[in-house]
Amino acid sequence: MELSSASTVKKKRQLAIFNAYATPLRQDERRLRASYEHGGVVGGHVASNEKVLLFDDFVDLISNSRSFYSKFTDHCFNLNQIPNTVFGCIFFAIDENNKGYLNVNDWFYFNNVLEYDNYHFIILYEFFRKFDAARERAYGPSVKSINYGNRFLSFDELYLDLEQFQATLRLLHSCVRDDFIVNNKLFLDWKQFRWLKWYQFYPRGLLQNGPHITLNSLISIVQNDLKSEKLLLGFHCLSQLDHRTNSMTISKNQLVYLMRLFYSHKIPADIFNSLNMSTLSCAKCDNNHINYNVFRDLFYLIQNFDLLNQIVHRYAEVHKFSDRDVREQHISRKDLLRFMNTEYNKINNIIEFSPAQISLLFSIVTNSKKLNYLNNARQNNPELSYHHRDSEIDSFIHNEYINGNAASSLHNESLEKFNDDFENIIQADAGDTKQQISSTDWRSVFSWSSFLSSFEWLHFKKRKSVQTNGLSDEYVNEALTLEDIMKIVNPNYLNDLVHHMELRRIESESRSSNLYFYPIFDSIYNFTLGSVAGCIGAMVVYPIDMVKTRMQAQRDFSKYKNSIDCLLKILSKEGVRGLYSGLGPQLIGVAPEKAIKLTVNDHMRATLAGRDGKLSLPCEIISGATAGACQVVFTNPLEIVKIRLQVKSDYVADAARNSVNAISVIKNLGLIGLYRGAGACLLRDIPFSAIYFPTYAHIKSNVFNFDPKDSDKRNKLNTWQLLVSGGLAGMPAAFLTTPFDVIKTRLQIDPKKGESVYNGIWDAARTILKEEGIKSFFKGGPARVLRSSPQFGFTLAAYEIFHNLFPAPRYDDSTTHRPTREPVGALAPINKTVSAFFPDQLEPHVGNNKWASRLYGPNIDPYSSSFLNYYYKSCQVAKAFMDLDYNFAHFDFNTYQQFHDELNAMKNKKH
């Protein structure tokens, strides 16, 4: 754990956030105010001119931390509701010495606690421990601090005074100002829990120490006993006698109120408006009379939403659903029950769901979908009708955000509107619970209709003509999809959608970014691998290249009748060594040639790719042509030296043959001479690459079904498949560009005595056609095909194999600082490449699972060691408090003030 004085990238970011929200204390204010004016601090402590976080400052910081980063959001779009006031509990817990504000040391302590796995339980414990510590200080002994980083520390060693714990909860209840809760006495009385005695213990076995409970016991109580106690209390306080059946029942409005009270922080808000008990054929109840059995079934479902979410995901996986299937394939209650009860590979071995409970689940999902349809078809003209704000979110997801330009102002405005709409929905749905419970028309409450995409409504219209005044429950029930269920059982559904889009956008931007060191290193890395791969390919086929050059250099067929005859004569006269004459310049030249060609082609393909990552055929041709043009600058000088050395036995006398080497050729030609035939070289290499690379890509895609961006296709090919792809692509490219290769070779060698001298490309073409015929333009063509095809096959196969064997190193922002472009708020945006953020994303998928969906349930956390997800973790802490007592949802400043005063009174109490 880092100290507050540690100077790291993370600490600097933490300090920047603190300074952005902290309130500077005035220099003339030597003592803090004793009042609570506008979130002020409590008196008694000497103040300096340091910056501090007041209550409202801290709550604003946590609430606004969702937008700290411009590239991704921190759970902005979760469908459950976490009141911002609960963050005041964290403020109270981490305020050392009950100062009434947080200084920078408190802030760093909070950041350190968030690093622990069980940070939410630690903060919950610290909240109640403050009162125990205050009592102990009043008696005299000092209170020891706890090192939560100690791996030997057990939650059984952390305990609380049970009587003080209960007194703290009673203090919370005394602060509640909700008339409905107060009038109906919806307070958990811990003194009435008969099972509590089984959790308590006495430190050191001494009765005078009083009963205590450990943190482990408290967690067990929250996870088990309190759930039942809340339901019993709620039903007992609100139920009334139904004279028809002589049984106790509650109304739908009362049920919804209890659901909001107990689970609004954990389940999607859409559920509250999707209850309609009159549609339950298997339960003898209606919206005015809901019996205890249905009441418990509903909360049983809610408590097991996580398992249900995993079941529907497993259903999609077993049936090999694609993302589209998840949205469109229908599922019935019988289908789901049959799947859950399958004997082999059973999912729910411990938790069981009855048919009545599954019917209740489908009723909720059906009502939600029906309300969505009615809201979208409210008027006769859907295009001009009013849509709820949440339908705008759906339009944004499926249109603007996916296809928008991240760098454009229009995109930024759309994203801001998206955020505003979402906030309005949350605020509208949260409402005043008192007013909602007394309202007779619950349909007037704003409905979460957001998450059915427009094509689903079109799908409804195509399947069945339905009037706008209603939908058949049976019809909607039959038309439910897995996605419909996911929207109900998973409060992170929308956030997961947005998160995947953000990951794809970060990945897309990282490919084209040229402002950071990593892309530069990436090019050097590709250049090196391309060089080595090119040398391997050149050495394998160099003898064929020798035959090709000799055949193209001769102006008649007096010496070599064909390629085979040429090969045999070279072997007989010059030996095997003669086949590799000029190999040195070839290896020197092939390294930059192949490396430049491969690197430029990769760069151009990434630059010209569309938003969906695909490349049109003209763009593929442009990419290949650009790569071929760039290589000529480096390779033409070395190629002319190679050719001179390859034909020296035919054009140089025996006495002078040994004196001809690469250095002598360079001295003889000079700088300008080294670029002789460069124009013909361009005419050869540009069309060659323009033909080769698109052909290579299409053979891999169409013949071998290769597409790493498509989960339904292969993301890796075998070596032989790479060789075949490269070899087949090289054949048409090599043969069709042979005439330009012949012209280039003729221009780059000196003619023998009596042979015509060429004055440029067109003169050479006319002379060859006139003196030798059109057939001479394809001299060495078979040898060129045999050389180029396997050479590029070996080169590209080696290039891709090296990429797999020697992956590029990944950089972390903690070791390599990169400049930022557009700081947002207190933090700069993310500038890392996707490989640095998400190394797991680069690992190949195991197996051939068709439903390797990137739309549901992302398992990637975009927070590295340098980025901080305050909002998500603070929400987890808030859930822990609300699970313990739902009244923590109203821990506003007035409540905090009473807790602060009570704690100070305990400290100052004299015994």
UniProtKB/Swiss-Prot annotation:
Disulfide bonds: none annotated. One of its GO terms (biological process) is malate-aspartate shuttle. Solcar repeats lie at residues 521-607, 615-702, 717-805. Keywords: Amino-acid transport, Calcium, Membrane, Mitochondrion, Mitochondrion inner membrane, Repeat, Transmembrane, Transmembrane helix, Transport. GO terms for cellular component: mitochondrial inner membrane. It is a multi-pass membrane protein. It is found in: Mitochondrion inner membrane. Signal peptide: none annotated. Pfam families: Mito_carr. Gene3D superfamilies: Mitochondrial carrier domain. Belongs to the mitochondrial carrier (TC 2.A.29) family. Calcium-dependent mitochondrial aspartate and glutamate carrier. Transport of glutamate in mitochondria is required for mitochondrial transamination reactions and ornithine synthesis. Plays also a role in malate-aspartate NADH shuttle, which is critical for growth on acetate and fatty acids. This is Mitochondrial aspartate-glutamate transporter AGC1. It comes from Eremothecium gossypii (strain ATCC 10895 / CBS 109.51 / FGSC 9923 / NRRL Y-1056). The lineage of its organism: Eukaryota, Fungi, Dikarya, Ascomycota, Saccharomycotina.
